[in-house]
């Protein structure tokens, strides 16, 4: 067909610029709580996008693409700003009336109407003579109909005429009729069967007839151009004629010549009417007044009608002649002719199909306000992220479980070391190196120099002996002071009134005895350390010799020379230690060689599978990390209960990764089973079993030897810890002894000064009184002095000598003999105390400068009347003497317990000097009672027995 049939295009709506920025900024500030200024660029992009779409382009593909983009952004914009109010002015496409609304739906409907106008214009201008133009001409009317259908289905209340349901429905009918027309033209052009062309033409004629009937209802309303009606009427009659013509051709071919002749007459009648209308349309059509039609619409339509009229006329005349001369068939009436079937019309292309195209998606581009995500979308995205995290955790758990099974299986089979050992058996590699455990190697590095331990053991003995000597010296000083006091009392009785020192030194003596008992326990701990060191010294010397000597010793043991290293290793265990490498037969060697090759191949394959599995897991994690469904959630925001289906469909993207991971896990387990079977098969060989037995014996001996060395190392660590505690204990005991020494010195010096003053006062009074001791008194005094010289002061039970388990005994006073004479005024010895912990000094927590007792020391008041004679004086025990109050209960102090308390001193004279006219009333320094001492075994720091420190000592193993 040389002339192209004219098509009708939908008129275009027009508009002016709008302000997007101000309403969007207001919504961002009010609803999202963000800074609107940060979205100024997005607002400008949206503003420019609208201007380009509605004003910057014509009726070409560029205009269509810009409109596609703008409408897509409107869809995304509505998801975030559904209630935004912007004034959108649009002029009606048919009446040119201005309509302004603030609804975003009005803007969307107007843009869709404008898109349909552009699509219909593209269909109108497409050249149908080439295949590509024909495709566009057939596609665009259907896409236009789909766009208009979307308007009718989604925008119910039209604010303008061009968006009303009746007008839009009429436009849809015109577009679909034109699409059917183009399809019929294609069938005619391709010379398809006459019956098929007749059916398609009948459908086209029916659609045009329906549109003509609808348009007649708008007559006189000034909506549609009257030229549209002329074109539609002409096309309705044209395609009706085409229907009858091609059906007649089909009937004639079928031998129905009478029916064919009747149909040709009908076709000729219809085309004659169409020709009359087309001829008049040429004179009434003005192209400038109807821009929706091509400028040559009248001429083109007239040419098409005229050409078909000529064909119909010739065909009718020929059919009449043939029937009159040849067929002589009776012509049926028109009413009796069978109805012609209609070809089903093509469906409109929906807007979803248009925007589902990848090219259109690329045109839309990313969301302009991508950074602005509603809270509901954030919440849904968080739920999806948790679903992804569950998926990843499940796959990671499966992979970790599979890896653990593989590692446990390889460790159980001792692979790949077992295969290397098989290779050594085959190659006769007699490597005598004995691998040492990592624990033993670490122990070698930690032993260090053993000479320091021997030096510290020597220091312990020296410190213990020095402490014992000093404590006994302090006991001796107290004994000497007590003897001197009693000697003066016997000499100057009854005028010598100095109180006995026994009650005053009870606590000091108790402290000294407790320290000696503690030294006895410390001696036991020291002896235990010494014994333990002697038992492990050879092993520790070997460990300290370095890794090379240790490996040499291990080789000596495996070679049967254990007497050089460890006498506890039985030579009977090493009789068969030298493995006979030639115990395998040739058949077993061949089988073992094949097993080595198979094992290596399977291990290599297992390594590749593990690497591939880990790579797939990394890819899965990266894929899940970068996966974002916020846009999909935003698009489906208005849908109800869509999240489960959406999440399920999105998670299906990761199904291939899960499948690959499952396959890798299954393959690794299969290979592990094959390796297990391979090792079991190799171990079944008789010669190999013998080799394994000897190797196991060899390994057992080495492990036992290593175990003994490790136990020696643990004992060595205990010795070093005990030495540290013991030396710290003796250092602390030294400080306590020094405090006791100072207290004893203060006490003895004070007592000596008091005696001097008292003796001087007695001698002065005797000289002034002119009296002298009587001869009998002198004789009596001499006898008493002789008895006192032989007097042996009763001391508390002595602790045993160091190295024994009993309490050491204090030495007798130097220079005095033993005597059974006891003075009636001497206090009874303190009750024996249980063996004390040498490190627990909590019993002396209230002495000296370390702490102040919680109760003040009471002063002992003596009567002022003359004292009884020495041989008439009776001793009152401390618990019955009213001048000696009971000792206060021992408080708990944080200070060192054995530091004695210094008695109060007065400047200028002795605290024990009596006031004038009175007998001396010395202030007795009081010491806390040690009745409730808690005893422990081992070393403890003095003063720390109850407040931390080292507690029960190092000596308890």
Swiss-Prot record:
User: Compositional bias (Polar residues) spans?
Assistant: 851-871
Q: Which domain of life is it from?
A: Eukaryota
BRO1 domain location, by residue?
Answer: 6-406
Chief site of localization = cytoplasm
Q: Where is the composition biased (Low complexity)?
A: 926-944
Q: Which UniProt keywords apply?
A: Coiled coil, Cytoplasm, Endosome, Protein transport, Transport
Q: Where is the composition biased (Basic and acidic residues)?
A: 751-766
Q: Give the residue ranges for region: Disordered.
A: 751-779, 795-957
Please state where this protein is localized.
Cytoplasm; Endosome
* Purpose: Involved in concentration and sorting of cargo proteins of the multivesicular body (MVB) for incorporation into intralumenal vesicles.
What is this protein's name? Vacuolar protein-sorting protein BRO1
Q: Which organism is it from?
A: Cryptococcus neoformans var. neoformans serotype D (strain B-3501A) (Filobasidiella neoformans)
Which gene codes for it? BRO1
